[in-house]
Amino acid sequence: MHITLLCVGKLKEDFLLLAQKEYLKRLSPYARIELVEVREESLPASGRAGALEAVLKKEGTRLLERIPDNCVTIALDRKGMMLSSKEFAGYLAELGLRGQNKLCFIIGGSAGLAGDVLARASLRLSFSKFTFPHQLMRIILLEQIYRAFKIIRGEKYHL
């Protein structure tokens, strides 16, 4: 399986970079993971009407340009569908059975994702009603993808 993580912004903190490196290593026997980062816009300091929408539009344009061809697109969205780890594993397994082996997960920036990016997604996925920093969400997503492959293969998983 080929999985693209399309993310707004770069990881800067060492602990997040180490966690990302660890999960990419753990995932290497199961899937080819490609990280694609697009530039994050600065959020406006003022509450000027339309400023947030302008940020979403700029980031959204960058994201849409980088979505690989012929892939199943999954946008992380706090208003999306919530799945258990087993349900998520089942979803990935079903995609594989249907021959859909190219996936693209999209993680927005601080402002979230533009409506046109959400509309492009085959699935809008939520991990919780909580709001997480988008940098941390990347690590949580990698962990859940790893857990899903362990579930699919019937392998034990303990950290």
Swiss-Prot record:
A cellular-component GO term for this protein: cytoplasm
Protein's UniProt keywords contain Methyltransferase: yes
Subunit structure: Homodimer.
InterPro entries associated with the record: Alpha/beta_knot_MTases, RlmH-like, tRNA_m1G_MTases_N
Positions contributing to S-adenosyl-L-methionine binding: L76, G108
Recorded GO MF terms: rRNA (pseudouridine-N3-)-methyltransferase activity
PANTHER family per the UniProt record, alphabetical: METHYLTRANSFERASE, RIBOSOMAL RNA LARGE SUBUNIT METHYLTRANSFERASE H
Main function: Specifically methylates the pseudouridine at position 1915 (m3Psi1915) in 23S rRNA.
Name assigned to this protein: Ribosomal RNA large subunit methyltransferase H
Enzyme nomenclature, EC number: 2.1.1.177
Record key words, sorted: Cytoplasm, Methyltransferase, rRNA processing, S-adenosyl-L-methionine, Transferase
The keyword Coiled coil is annotated on this UniProt entry: no
Gene3D superfamilies noted in UniProt: 3.40.1280.10
Family as reported in the entry's similarity comment: Belongs to the RNA methyltransferase RlmH family.
Localization per Swiss-Prot or TrEMBL: Cytoplasm
Lineage: Bacteria, Bacillati, Bacillota, Clostridia, Eubacteriales
Superkingdom of origin organism: Bacteria
Reaction equation(s) it catalyzes: pseudouridine(1915) in 23S rRNA + S-adenosyl-L-methionine = N(3)-methylpseudouridine(1915) in 23S rRNA + S-adenosyl-L-homocysteine + H(+)
